[in-house]
């Protein structure tokens, strides 16, 4: 285990993204960076200033490959920003915290947590859910107003940590159907779709 210094703002960000009591900072950062729980720790030491810092991580398998972009370092004390893009295929199950799900009082809270996990697993593809609609109204949109315009008493709620909104004034069966359609749209197998439905 290595120690690093971080500023107060980063510390607060990590602390607010804790999903359960006892979760380590490493686990939180792995989740936020989409590195998964099995990623190897890599240490880079720079003793002298250089123009470019390059980090290479050799993946154990193609599925766990990680792309690293380099950043220029202009002064020895300046901070280099390294953007890490995970290429592994994350699933909603990597982001579901069953303890937090169980603590929700009602179906709406569980529904929003499951949708938030789907968004975190597939942030780039999640927009496909805005095509899911009922006979007379939209179920998902990228603004509260769009959902309000599509019908009365929709009770739009923002999906946590995402730019998307969903209607919540529907029964549990309808919510399960919405989760089913969203999961199918995001490419889940029939068995995984059923597991996602049952989380509600």
From Swiss-Prot:
GO biological process assignments: negative regulation of DNA-templated DNA replication initiation; regulation of DNA-templated transcription
Gene3D superfamilies: Met repressor-like (1.10.1220.10), Replication modulator SeqA, C-terminal DNA-binding domain (1.20.1380.10)
Keywords: Cytoplasm, DNA replication inhibitor, DNA-binding
GO molecular function: DNA binding
Pfam families per record: SeqA (PF03925), SeqA_N (PF17206)
Localization terms from the record: Cytoplasm
Chain spans, region Interaction with DNA: 107-108
Principal subcellular localisation of the protein: cytoplasm
Top-level taxonomic group: Bacteria
Annotated Gene Ontology cellular component terms: cytoplasm
Subunit structure: Homodimer. Polymerizes to form helical filaments.
Family annotation (HAMAP family): SeqA
Role, per record: Negative regulator of replication initiation, which contributes to regulation of DNA replication and ensures that replication initiation occurs exactly once per chromosome per cell cycle. Binds to pairs of hemimethylated GATC sequences in the oriC region, thus preventing assembly of replication proteins and re-initiation at newly replicated origins. Repression is relieved when the region becomes fully methylated.
Family: Belongs to the SeqA family.
Name listed for the protein in its UniProt record: Negative modulator of initiation of replication
UniProt source species: Colwellia psychrerythraea (strain 34H / ATCC BAA-681)
């Amino acid at each position: 285990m290595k120690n690093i210094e971080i500023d107060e703002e980063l510390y607060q960000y990590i602390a607010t993204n804790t999903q359960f009591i006892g979760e380590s900072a490493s686990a939180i950062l792995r989740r936020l960076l989409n590195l998964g729980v099995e990623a190897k720790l890599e240490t880079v030491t720079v003793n002298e200033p250089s123009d470019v810092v390059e980090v290479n991580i050799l993946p154990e398998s193609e599925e766990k490959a990680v792309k690293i972009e380099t950043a220029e370092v202009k002064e020895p004390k300046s901070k280099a920003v390294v953007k890490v893009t995970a290429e592994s295929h994350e699933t909603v199950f990597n982001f579901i915290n069953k303890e937090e799900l169980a603590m929700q009082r009602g179906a709406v809270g569980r529904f929003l947590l499951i949708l938030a996990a789907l968004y975190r697993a597939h942030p780039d593809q999640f927009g496909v859910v805005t095509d899911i609609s009922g006979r007379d109204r939209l179920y998902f949109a990228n603004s509260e107003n769009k959902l309000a315009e599509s019908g009365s008493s929709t009770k739009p709620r923002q999906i946590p940590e995402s730019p998307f909104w969903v209607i919540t004034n529907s029964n549990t069966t309808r919510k399960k159907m919405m989760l089913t359609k969203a999961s199918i749209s995001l490419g889940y197998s029939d068995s995984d779709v059923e597991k996602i439905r049952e989380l509600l």
